[in-house]
Every structure is written in structure tokens, then in C-alpha cells.
Amino acid sequence: MQAILSSWFIQGMIKATSDMWHKGWDERNGGNISLRLLAEEVEPYRRDFYQHPRKVELTQPAPELANSWFLVTGSGKFFRNVELNPAENLVLLQVSNDGMAYHIHWGLTQGGLPTSELAAHFQSHIVRMQVSGGTNRVIMHCHATNLIALSYVQKLENASFTRLLWEGSTECLVVFPDGIGIVPWMVPGTDGIGTQTAEQMREHSLVLWPFHGIFGSGPTLDDAFGLIDTAEKSAEIMVKVLSMGGKKQTISREQLIALAARFDVTPMAAALDA
């Protein structure tokens, strides 16, 4: 067995993709994850790498990510199959030193490419690296059922959507005080939707793609998963509340401010006033 299969990052990706599939967020080949790795984390597994790594040109140059390593889910791959055959469904790649291409060093044993949303992932990684001082290393996308459902019936505006989720569960303001960003509906797998997502990622760790899914970022796979899980739980509660006729009482603005003070977070000001 290849040593890399027992690495923390392969095992972590197996756990994340399995959990997300069991949640019902990643039907068929839906969803994608990218994890930025450090050179020293990858180095011990070089003996498992391809002798002649395949080079693929990027549709959008990413010089800010030059020489960076990423573990990424494959395009057209099913999350439910990652734990059965990680080498077929995942890919370890390194961006070239000019940021114009990447080399596939491991994975995708049956051929193929990384996720079709790689442009969105890379653009979001660049922004989250900047705003987090390099601590954010994960971009995660999935089709979270109730967040998608709310996008059909709620105003697609950052502040009001954030406020709705904050009121849906007390922990939400603590977990994502920076709120949720929203992009217009756009064709997926394009540089354009990647640019729009990255712009929202500058202010928000969560970005909603209406009628499609959610993007989340964080330092670790657990953090990114937990962020989406928390928002999706609140969305599920609000879907049930709306189905029962709507709110009769809720968490007030003053209570949200008190909550933020207790947990020493700075809430999105526009959402407090929404």
C-alpha cells in the first residue's frame, strides 16, 4: 500500500467527503473540496508520486499560488467513492512556479482532471490567504439542501440572509460573525463565477450560490465542514419555521449584540440592522 494513503490529509479528505455524502449534500458528482498543503507536509510521500507528472494549463493564471500544493477532489468523481478508492477520486497537484499551470503528482489513476470548479477554488484560496494571514487552507463546496431551498424564497441580499440564519440558531453569530455573501446565479465551472465568489470571500467565509449550493472556507477540513454544517442546520430550522407559518418571536438585535460581546466576536454590522 502506498504510504500516502495513510497520511493525515488523505485520511482527512476521506472523512470529509464521506461525512458530506452522508449528510446528503453531495449527490452523484456534486461538490468539491481543495486543501492547501505545505511543502514539508507533502515531502515524506514523494516516493509515491508519478515519475512524469502531467502538466495542465490553468484557464486563469494564479501567480499568487506559485509552487503551492493542493489536494483536490476530481472532476466527475462521486464523494461516496472516495473512501473506496481515494487514489482514483482525489488528486495531489502543485501549481507551477509561474502560476500558469499545475502538475498532477498523485491520484486520478483512471485519468481525468481536478474539479471543474478549480478556478473558483484557486481564486478563493488567494483571497482567504490574504485576509486570514495564510491560516485558511480549505475551500469546500457542496449542495446543502436547506440553504438552497431558502435561496428560492428569501431576498438574495447578504445582510438580510445573514440575519435570518443568525436568528435560526443562537450559535450562528458566534460561528460566522462575518455573515454570508451571495453571488448572482451564474453558470458553474467558469472563471466568472470564481471571480464573483472570491470577491465575496474577501468579507465572508461563507458564500451562497443561489439555487445551487454553498462555498465555505476555514483553516482545516473540520472548520470548513463545521461552518457549513452550522449554517445548514439554521437553514433547516428556518425552512421548518416558514412551513409552520413563520416566526412569532425571534432573537432580537440587542440579544445578538449581547451574544457577540459574550463570545468576543465582531458581527457584520449590516446584518444587525437588517
From Swiss-Prot:
Co-factor: note: Binds 1 zinc ion per subunit.
Keyword tags: Cytoplasm, Lyase, Metal-binding, Rhamnose metabolism, Zinc
Compartment(s): Cytoplasm
Known cofactor(s): Zn(2+)
Reactions that this protein is recorded to catalyse: L-rhamnulose 1-phosphate = (S)-lactaldehyde + dihydroxyacetone phosphate
Database matches in NCBIfam families: PRK03634.1, rhamnu_1P_ald
Similarity comment: Belongs to the aldolase class II family. RhaD subfamily.
Protein's name according to its UniProt entry: Rhamnulose-1-phosphate aldolase
Origin species: Yersinia pseudotuberculosis serotype IB (strain PB1/+)
Gene (UniProt): rhaD
